[in-house]
UniProtKB/Swiss-Prot annotation:
Residues 1-104 are annotated as: RU A. Residues 111-248 are annotated as: RU B. Keywords: Hydrolase, Magnesium, Metal-binding. Its EC number is 3.5.2.15. Mg(2+) binds at residues 301, 350, 353-355, 358. One of its GO terms (biological process) is atrazine catabolic process. Pathway: Xenobiotic degradation; atrazine degradation; biuret from cyanurate: step 1/1. Coiled coil: none annotated. This is Cyanuric acid amidohydrolase. Residues 254-367 are annotated as: RU C.
Length: 367
């Protein structure tokens, strides 16, 4: 029987492993039982954000030392998903998922379960296209099996780290006579995120295979997953996948619930996600209920219309600050205003992740 524990740890810098080290040294975390680390790092979240790789390297080197294995073995064992960009009041932090094998009976109902899977490395010309969609769909099903989740309806959040195109990778494709989905390296992040999200939707039966095509990726915004959260980075060539849901094959003291924000200021969806995770309240959650929250995970996106509820904004027109950065700041502030804590995970760029301008939101909470 699996028992999943989740630890949210603030960080003082991308290479700060002190909080994790304290929990390991105190015996609260067995490093051999860590299956995934999800983080928010204080870079720009764009192509040249190397805080993601810096954080991953620092964590992997530390765990390699503690486990007595190589760094290469660590990154094959643990999914490291670092999302850059902590604009506004968002607090840099990591969320550590620990999965134990225990000789305990299952708890009443369904409890938190987590599974991890990795796709193969992608060629540059495969990013943002059906090759990526189909491979991600395969890996999501593998992660569900790893989590012992049988029903797709029990999956509440699928976090993915996916690759992007660089000038070097684009040139590599051209030398081999191949074309890439887009020559703009920043836009390639959107295509990779979008294809990965549609892979989630395909795996979970949210969208049928006949509706997904190369032409639909980053064009048909009616196609989306309600539980996918994808983040692109320069530090990898494959997709790393964490499936989080509830299972009868779990003795965890935690559960996860979710909702979907219809736009960047949808506080009602935040409260709906809290209730789906088991929090009890009428209008506003009281302090004793908020204390049950382990973390909130969400996506943020500027609507393609350039408006929110009919009011114009300039996120898409700002040449100085990319719209994903503004969107992260807004959504983090909305969530923080409801839960009373700015240390929540908000990732920018929600292509095919929730409706246009909105995005999935999930809450992990203690029972």
């Amino acid at each position: 029987m699996q028992k999943v524990e989740v630890f949210r740890i603030p960080t003082a810098s991308p290479d700060d492993i002190s909080g994790l080290a304290t929990l390991i040294d105190s015996g609260k975390i067995n490093p051999a039982e860590i299956v995934a680390i999800l983080g928010k790092t204080e870079g720009n979240g764009c192509v040249n954000d190397f805080t993601r790789g810096f954080a991953t390297q620092s964590l992997a080197m530390y765990l390699a030392e503690k486990l007595g294995i190589s760094r290469e073995e660590v990154v094959k064992k643990v999914a490291f998903i670092m999302s850059g960009g902590t604009e506004g009041v968002m607090t840099p932090h990591i969320t550590v998922f620990v999965r134990k094998d225990v000789q305990e009976p299952a708890k009443p109902g369904k409890r938190l379960a987590v599974g991890v899977a990795f796709t193969r490395d992608f060629l540059p010309e495969e990013l943002g296209r059906m090759e990526q969609v189909n491979e991600v769909a395969r890996a999501v099903k593998e992660a569900m099996k790893d989590a012992q989740i049988d029903d797709p309806r029990d999956v509440h959040f699928v976090q993915i780290k996916c690759p992007l195109l660089t000038a070097e990778r684009i040139e590599d494709a051209k030398r081999r006579g191949k074309d890439v989905v887009v020559n703009d390296t920043y836009k390639s992040m959107a295509y990779s995120r979008g294809a990965s999200a549609l892979g989630v939707a395909l795996a979970l039966g949210e969208i049928s295979a006949d509706k997904i095509s190369n032409e639909a990726i980053c064009h048909d915004w009616n196609l989306y997953s309600s539980v996918a959260s994808t983040s692109a980075g320069v530090e990898l060539l494959n997709d790393e996948i964490i499936v989080v849901g509830n299972s009868t094959n779990s003795a965890s003291d935690l559960v996860i619930g979710h909702s979907v924000m219809k736009d960047a200021i949808d506080a009602d969806a935040v409260r709906a996600a809290l209730k789906d995770a088991g929090l009890k309240f009428d209008c506003c959650p009281p302090a004793e209920e908020l204390a049950k929250i382990v973390n909130v995970l969400a996506k943020a996106e500027a609507a393609s219309s350039g408006t929110v509820r009919g009011r114009r904004n300039t996120m898409l027109d700002d040449s100085d600050i990319n719209h994903t950065r503004s969107a992260r700041a807004v959504v983090n502030a909305v969530i923080a205003s409801v839960v009373g804590d700015p240390m929540v995970y908000v990732s920018g760029g929600a292509e095919h992740q929730g409706p246009d301008g909105g995005g999935p939101i999930a809450v992990i909470a203690r029972v």
